[in-house]
Amino acid sequence: MTNIRKTHPLMKIINNAFIDLPTPSNISSWWNFGSLLGLCLIMQILTGLFLAMHYTPDTTTAFSSVAHICRDVNYGWIIRYLHANGASMFFICLYAHIGRGLYYGSYIFQETWNIGVILLLAVMATAFVGYVLPWGQMSFWGATVITNLLSAIPYIGTTLVEWIWGGFSVDKATLTRFFAFHFILPFIILALAAVHLLFLHETGSNNPMGIPSDMDKIPFHPYYTIKDILGALLLIVILLALTLFAPDLLGDPDNYTPANPLSTPAHIKPEWYFLFAYAILRSIPNKLGGVLALFLSILVLLFIPLLHTSKQRSMMFRPFSQFLFWLLVADFLTLTWIGGQPVEHPYMILGQLASILYFLLILVLMPMASLIENKLLKW
């Protein structure tokens, strides 16, 4: 008799995705981030659900309801900080996952890559609306500044901003709708992640060498299930260490002050995972130009498969491209640092140079390096 996992309609799907899935035998730990992102998403949904049971999306009570969760709800403090720091872990895994895709040429699977970019945008939107919910100073002013950017859109800008706000400023209506968005988006992300996986399993996984691995595949279980469990344990240990020893390390102290429309914080800045895009936004003196650059800093990922000029898929055997890749990583970190600094000399000029380099590397230098490498190899 055939095993039930191979015949049952539901079990069959799980079996083909996580148990009997043929997987390249040589994928490294950089391939762990997919499962870690799944784990992060499940953790965020669960902690978020418990937070939503006690949170009130109203301008008068939002801040105090978060304080109530931390002080009066059983283990509310750990649920809140797991959720806040879980978002940071989520983005660390996301950026590592994207970096892996860039380095090893995983973007050649175009459908998987494009859905991944949509997923990134959805996660960023979720994190942004979520940051507004505690209704601290940085929540309020972050929401005001970022939503206000849409007013740069010609003709419809102002109307659009007021439509999103539900009034003439960030107020009760804004907070309520942001809570609704923050609740629904993770479930949309979950569905998109399933589609992401569906497209990946159409082609099978890439591998570090970027060559076909059909002749050398092993079952996902037990080899990669055990490897994923190790990755998950490491993630949980790091998250718990962050949550229990330094819960506010990555947060902003301004968010412990209740929102006050009459007093602007000295330095308005988003959470650390948006700082690179914020630095690019601030580098351009024109409002509309800045907004376009902000969106392009993410959407540029969609052009990467079209700009692949190398005859090889992976960067494993391409030293020029490797150098430019790590330069891009350094540039990303530089932008992240600049985004958290005040708008003054020398940070402004550094930010502008880093922003130019960011787009130059992705759109010009990396495709050119690939062509040079092809020539050197007489391909």
Curated annotation (Swiss-Prot):
Binds 2 heme b groups non-covalently. GO terms for cellular component: mitochondrial inner membrane; respiratory chain complex III. It is a multi-pass membrane protein. It is found in: Mitochondrion inner membrane. Heme b b566 binds at residues 97, 196. Component of the ubiquinol-cytochrome c reductase complex (complex III or cytochrome b-c1 complex) that is part of the mitochondrial respiratory chain. The b-c1 complex mediates electron transfer from ubiquinol to cytochrome c. Contributes to the generation of a proton gradient across the mitochondrial membrane that is then used for ATP synthesis. Its cofactor is heme b. This is Cytochrome b. One of its GO terms (molecular function) is ubiquinol-cytochrome-c reductase activity. Keywords: Electron transport, Heme, Iron, Membrane, Metal-binding, Mitochondrion, Mitochondrion inner membrane, Respiratory chain, Transmembrane, Transmembrane helix, Transport, Ubiquinone. The gene is MT-CYB. The cytochrome bc1 complex contains 11 subunits: 3 respiratory subunits (MT-CYB, CYC1 and UQCRFS1), 2 core proteins (UQCRC1 and UQCRC2) and 6 low-molecular weight proteins (UQCRH/QCR6, UQCRB/QCR7, UQCRQ/QCR8, UQCR10/QCR9, UQCR11/QCR10 and a cleavage product of UQCRFS1). This cytochrome bc1 complex then forms a dimer. Belongs to the cytochrome b family. The chain crosses the membrane at residues 33-53, 77-98, 113-133, 178-198, 226-246, 288-308, 320-340, 347-367.
